[in-house]
């Protein structure tokens, strides 16, 4: 029996400000075994979602008594090296507060680049290095550092924009939502959960069907999460094959849901098997 009644896939964007209407922000939802469908933003003058709008919508959805698994495609934390360099305790909730104080990317009229160039915030006191990678990025093979800005496929800007949003969700929802794996590798029965995902693991396995790349990434997230939940494989990916020390690190740095954890002969972590195009939830 599936653990979650619905899944939500979010293709994120760190462009512009928290209230900017962004074409790259896309949300798909899967419920009741049906095909994933796009969720439009609430009626307003804005054509597309805003980061703040998505956060507020998630608060409403996750406050409902419907076990929901949400996958968001930006980094949820930083490499352990970052904590060491800046003298921070390896504590994720404390990290969220500290990061938002220095990188208040959730504030009105604030671009990530405003903080990068020193015109706002205190980002200079909390810098990272593009050579620093989390364990999960090393195992993913191809995933870029959360500090690797200004390159194709970078998640740095979306990560720096998105982490304060996670803090907002945690403050508003409290224990109602399980932030995986920071709150533990096991998601309590009946609880909703939010996890970091990497849609490149799955997107090639589904037919594009006229969707834009952003739409397809969000569709792939929601669809794969629902399929994995229904066929029982999700439980395996929620418990990746990591040593005890690796698990300790990953509960600070975070982990990409969909990576099994153990290295294969090529030095890359085992990943979800590629599901053929045209598969459905039925």
Give the positions of each predicted feature.
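RNase H-like (RuvC/DEDD) metal-dependent nuclease/polynucleotide-processing core
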Residues: 1-8, 12-282
């Amino acid at each position: 029996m599936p653990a979650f009644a619905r899944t939500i896939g979010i293709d994120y964007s760190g462009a512009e400000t928290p209230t900017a209407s962004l074409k790259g922000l896309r949300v798909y939802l899967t419920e009741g075994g049906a095909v994933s469908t796009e969720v439009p933003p609430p009626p307003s003058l804005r054509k597309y979602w805003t980061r703040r709008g998505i956060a507020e919508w998630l608060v409403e959805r996750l406050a409902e008594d419907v076990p929901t698994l949400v996958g968001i495609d930006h980094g949820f934390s930083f490499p352990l090296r970052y904590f060491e360099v800046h003298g921070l305790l390896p504590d994720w909730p404390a990290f969220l507060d500290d990061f938002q104080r220095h990188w208040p990317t959730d504030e009105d009229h604030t671009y990530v680049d405003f903080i990068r160039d020193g015109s706002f915030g205190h980002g200079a006191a909390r810098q990272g290095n593009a050579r620093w990678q989390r364990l999960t990025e090393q195992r993913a093979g191809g995933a870029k550092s959360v500090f690797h800005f200004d390159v194709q496929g970078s998640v740095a800007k979306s990560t720096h924009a998105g982490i304060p949003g996670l803090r907002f969700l945690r403050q508003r929802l409290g224990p109602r939502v399980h932030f995986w794996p920071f709150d533990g590798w096991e998601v309590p029965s009946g609880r909703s959960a939010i996890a970091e995902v990497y849609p490149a693991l799955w997107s090639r396995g589904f037919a594009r069907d006229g969707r834009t790349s952003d739409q397809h990434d969000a569709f792939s997230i929601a669809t794969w999460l629902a399929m994995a939940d229904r066929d029982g494989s999700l439980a395996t990916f929620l418990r990746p094959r990591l040593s005890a020390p690796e698990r300790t690190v990953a509960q600070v740095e975070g982990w990409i849901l969909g990576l099994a954890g153990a290295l294969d002969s090529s030095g890359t972590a085992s990943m979800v098997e590629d599901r053929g195009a045209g598969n459905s939830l039925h």
